[in-house]
A protein has these predicted regions:
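Chalcogenol-based redox active-site neighborhoods
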Residues: 1-177
Length: 177
């Protein structure tokens, strides 16, 4: 059994190169946002909690954009399911990436679940990350289930604080405890 390993702030994050709904690709670091890429890993179109979360992300995406933050929602869904999610949340400013391999999800420290009922056989659980233009982790949060994610409005407030106070990434100490 492989246990997820958390990513460390101020260290490089794993590579991402994924197709986007609409035909382009999201390649982390190829065209970095001015301040952060906000990566929201979600469970898939089968998840109503994910839909609600992405609706809120889309609603606040213009505010993130004003602050130099690009919003990308990522799942292991295949193309058809990703298009359905994009339609459900009326994705405009939020890019919807898909075909995340489970090995890549694990590299990002995400938890994996076995499907039940109409869910995919296996899929990633949620995670939210802010990645700096240099490819290092600024903030990360992972969940074992769809509930209790960081509210999108709180993330926006955190971005504001980070910008105005020039606040460094925290949680970076990996020495002896």
């Amino acid at each position: 059994m492989t246990t997820p390993t958390p990513l460390m702030p101020r260290e490089r994050v794993p590579a991402l190169d994924l197709p986007l709904v609409g035909g382009d690709r999201y390649v982390l670091g190829a065209k970095p946002a001015q301040r952060f890429d906000l990566l929201v890993f979600y469970r898939g179109v089968h998840c109503p909690v994910c839909t609600k979360y992405l609706l809120e992300l889309e609603r606040l995406a213009p505010e993130f954009e004003k602050r130099g933050v690009r919003s990308v929602a990522i799942s292991s869904d295949e193309s058809e399911r990703a298009v359905k999610m994009a339609e459900k949340v009326k994705a405009n400013l939020v890019s919807i990436a898909f075909d995340l391999q489970l090995s890549a999800a694990r590299a990002w420290g995400l938890y994996l679940s076995a499907g039940r009922g109409e869910e995919p056989a296996y899929f990633n659980e949620p995670g939210v990350f802010l990645v700096k233009p240099d490819g290092t982790l600024y903030y990360g949060s992972t969940q074992t289930m769809p509930f209790a994610r960081p509210p999108i409005a709180d993330l926006l407030g955190a971005v504001d604080y980070a910008i105005t106070k020039d606040y460094p990434a925290r949680g970076e100490y990996a020495g002896e405890a």
